[in-house]
Amino acid sequence: MSERQGGQEQRTEADGMTTEGISETSQTLQALANGLPADAFAVLGPKPLAEGRRQVRVLAPGAEAMGLIDPRGKLLARMQASAIDGVFEGILAADGPYRLRIVWPDRVQEVEDPYAFAATLDESLLLQIAAGDGQAVRRALGAQHVHCGDVPGVRFAVWAPHAQRVAVVGDFNGWDVRRHPMRQRIGGFWELFLPRVEAGARYKYAVTAADGRVLLKADPVARQTELPPATASVVPSAAAFAWTDAAWMANRDPGAVPAPLSIYEVHAASWRRDGHNQPLDWPTLAEQLIPYVQQLGFTHIELLPITEHPFGGSWGYQPLGLYAPTARHGSPDGFAQFVDACHRAGIGVILDWVSAHFPDDAHGLAQFDGAALYEHADPREGMHRDWNTLIYNYGRPEVTAYLLGSALEWIEHYHLDGLRVDAVASMLYRDYGRAEGEWVPNAHGGRENLEAVAFLRQLNREIATQFPGVLTIAEESTAWPGVTAAISDGGLGFTHKWNMGWMHDTLGYMQRDPAERAQHHSQLTFGLVYAFDERFVLPLSHDEVVHGTGGLLGQMPGDDWRRFANLRAYLALMWAHPGDKLLFMGAEFGQWADWNHDQSLDWHLLDGARHRGMQQLVGDLNAALRRTPALYRGSHRADGFDWSVADDARNSVLAFVRHDPAGGAPLLAVSNLTPQPHHDYHVGVPRAGLWREILNTDSAHYGGSNLGNSGRLATEPVGMHGHAQRLRLTLPPLATIYLQAEK
């Protein structure tokens, strides 16, 4: 390469002493100027010359002039435009720090030379990622604020092993793919430190595939994103969030006495909307949602996926930004403030987290470096036919490290109290949603996805080890054994599993006309056959109020009075049933219509007394749960439950006793699921003395007919239903009652 001096070309020492060396440097610079694959660090930045001098080359297409300045702004040397468009060259007479003064058509920029810095990524971190370490992903990849010496900036790092070239493009370089090619590291990782880049800058990676295509990709490990439908990643804030939830975090003890778990499932974008039908931001959600959840007595909020997702109609279940809260509600710090406020209010936060699949949007993970990377190359393994999405390659350590890092990011960085892992069944089976011949057996010829099993165990092991007390809840719709069993016993290691069977059976029963229920009584009782096989959550979730089904209230049979009565009885039966509770927003006040993700819940319904009564009932159910150890201490233990009446199908009545394994007062729950009241109905109970009716869904407070048991009842010393005593009860129509033994 030559530098132009007075119109004459003179070879410099940095170019090498042979024509081959000059040609090679020229070719490299020309390739860089054309945005083609080449080693930028071989020719750009400072290169030593004789007598302590250095030659500096800079690639700045579109610049009008350039100089080299010292840290105080004094000119050290003027740079000359070379014969290669966009390349500037200059000579520094002495060693020492320098900066670039770049004259653009609209401004003058002073900044350090990114190609003057050595690699900043520790090679051991990259090896850890290649071995499947999620924490290493968090420390190494994405846009990280770092200092090189005393120079602040952002280190960009990404995994793209099939790429010929990767460059960072963004607001800081005019989105010019030529400006900032990255340094290639071992294992297919790429990195570049860009001085003085600030929080809020938008960026992407320009990835040159093996076939020469240039793909503009969002950062898989971006901590912040643009507001969809825009797709760029955003450099996050460098400042650490100031948490105020130390007391909550200290009390998150997995060894503590079992506590109530009652979850309010929320789609943040449609719980309530502003006057322009736009989603609320995190501060407004904190101001409105948290007191509401406190008032109703739920212990946790479970958020439908807020990981960034391009399509709002996916409800968040097709995410591409697994490390970033969606920009629909504001900044990442805004989300941290929301979680912090929840914790101060005594409410836990669970995130619906999707590790089963991802969409094929062009800016996302699909064919990230021009080839199958995060997904399988074979569509029989890599394509999810039910959802037209792509399946993660769980057999690739870098991919599982990416997923593990995401889970750990939400738990550690955002102080989340649990993850509900979506679509676990689709992960566990290679033939999920596939016909014969459309799937690839595992190494043993079976249908189990052994790599996914290993990943889920690793996920649960790491969370339990690093963050004891954090919940991991599986949405698993099959009979896979041991979902919540210990990994050492061959289980998957989740803390909880959604009881989809209970939901389908009982909701199906409640949707029937009461005249038909006698023939389907087993739908109410069968769940107790397996109720203690796993640590179950009973879910009445978003999936039950979409696709034309109507809200839970609208799915109940009969006239309006009976619909309300049916739903009240059902919810009270659910709260008494073994297992933890989950209720989707809107059900607590009896929303009639389908859930619509594009609009607010129908809050105006609370102008009606029956809807207010439903809401009051849910609050009272949570209050009963909190103050009645028999309802939660034995939720996952067979000794916490006894049948009293399981076989009265003719009257559609069932009754059972919940026990406190610590010896507290037992509770009797009785449901009459016909509109016919029953007087002098005998039910066996385990303890003699007075039993007090503590909840009756037929109470006038809730909109019922106010038939009940007038407070307290004394037992009769007559054995019944396997118990030594019995109660003579009045069973109101379409109602559930709770009675608790008094001391």
From Swiss-Prot:
It comes from Xanthomonas euvesicatoria pv. vesicatoria (strain 85-10). NCBIfam families: branching_enzym, PRK05402.1, PRK12313.1, PRK12568.1. It catalyses: Transfers a segment of a (1->4)-alpha-D-glucan chain to a primary hydroxy group in a similar glucan chain. One of its GO terms (biological process) is glycogen biosynthetic process. Catalyzes the formation of the alpha-1,6-glucosidic linkages in glycogen by scission of a 1,4-alpha-linked oligosaccharide from growing alpha-1,4-glucan chains and the subsequent attachment of the oligosaccharide to the alpha-1,6 position. The lineage of its organism: Bacteria, Pseudomonadati, Pseudomonadota, Gammaproteobacteria, Lysobacterales. Its EC number is 2.4.1.18. Belongs to the glycosyl hydrolase 13 family. GlgB subfamily. Gene3D superfamilies: Glycosidases, Golgi alpha-mannosidase II, Immunoglobulins. InterPro entries: A-amylase/branching_C, Branching_enzy, GlgB, GlgB_N, GlgB_N_E_set_prok, Glyco_hydro_13_cat_dom, Glyco_hydro_13_N, Glyco_hydro_b. Pathway: Glycan biosynthesis; glycogen biosynthesis. Keywords: Carbohydrate metabolism, Glycogen biosynthesis, Glycogen metabolism, Glycosyltransferase, Transferase. Monomer. The gene is glgB2. This is 1,4-alpha-glucan branching enzyme GlgB 2. It comes from the Bacteria.
